[in-house]
């Protein structure tokens, strides 16, 4: 038996985690937090409800609903299509340049977002323990492979102004607190015209933080363990 449970990736059975919590097991991050993050439509709605800047989006139950919206000229191309669940690292995401690009889309729940002409993609990894102690790693810049849409290079620290860096760190902290997330939270962001829009979040160690193994006094993996055990958080420099 175990007393404390965490997970490697968010695409797991959240109902099973909730049952374990009801049996008295501690799950970090909690099933309540995971339910919000696991579904991209719920995640985006959470951003809106908590005044977190993000791109405009629409939710669709299936491909027919999307096509009806396109026929009614309610979708502006180009745009970004995302599955609401089980998409990550470039999977379940597609740029739609015209209505023709919907032909081979899976018939599933989805969101369609405005395409943001961003200058940089940023990430902040933040840790929070049950006592409420919070620490961020440095804001980093991510460069993606054009074919796989996966992170290929991470630049640390990000080449951004002090003002933008402060905004990025503050938004990551606000999200961690608002989600009541215990453990790591990776916050992906778009930088556009010196303003930040939140793309999405992941409640786990993240590709943008692997450099912390060699570059920081405390790695993201160590920090996750420290946070869920309610230990004092480590030095992130």
Residue ranges and their predicted role:
Residues 1-68, 72, 86-87:
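Conserved N-proximal alpha/beta basic substrate-recognition cap immediately N-terminal to
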Residues 6, 27-28, 55, 80, ...:
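Structural detector of well-ordered beta-strand residues that form the stable sheet scaffold
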Residues 25, 46-52, 82-90, 146-157:
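Acidic/polar active-site rim loop that often engages polyanionic ligands
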Residues 56, 78-81, 110-113, 185-186, ...:
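A short linear hydrophobic-aromatic micro-motif
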Residues 92-187, 191-193:
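Internal nucleotide-binding/catalytic subdomain
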Residues 148-159, 200-213:
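Short, flexible active-site loops
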Residues 166-187, 192, 203-237:
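Active-site "cap" helix and flanking loop/linker of ATP-utilizing ligase/carboxylase catalytic domains
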């Amino acid at each position: 038996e175990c007393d404390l449970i965490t997970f490697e990736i968010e695409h797991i059975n959240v109902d099973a985690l909730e049952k374990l919590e009801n049996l008295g097991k501690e799950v970090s991050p909690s099933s309540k937090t995971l339910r919000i993050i696991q579904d991209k439509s719920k995640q985006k709605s959470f951003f809106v409800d908590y005044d977190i800047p993000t791109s405009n989006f629409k939710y669709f139950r299936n491909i027919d609903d999307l096509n009806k919206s396109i026929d009614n000229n309610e979708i502006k191309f180009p745009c970004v299509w995302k599955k609401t669940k089980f998409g990550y690292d470039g999977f379940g995401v597609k740029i739609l340049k015209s209505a023709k690009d919907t032909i081979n889309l899976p018939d599933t729940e989805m969101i369609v977002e405005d395409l943001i002409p961003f200058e940089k993609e940023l990430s902040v990894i933040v840790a929070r323990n049950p006592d409420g102690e919070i620490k961020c790693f440095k804001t980093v810049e991510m460069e993606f492979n054009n074919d796989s849409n996966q992170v290929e290079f991470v630049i640390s620290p990000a080449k951004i102004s002090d003002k933008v860096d402060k905004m990025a760190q503050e938004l990551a902290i606000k999200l961690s607190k608002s989600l009541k997330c215990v453990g790591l939270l990776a916050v992906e962001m778009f930088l556009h015209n010196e303003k930040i829009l939140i793309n999405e979040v992941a409640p786990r160690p993240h590709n943008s933080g692997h450099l912390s193994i060699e570059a920081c006094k405390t790695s993201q993996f160590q920090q996750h363990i420290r946070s869920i055990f309610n230990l004092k958080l480590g030095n992130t420099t």
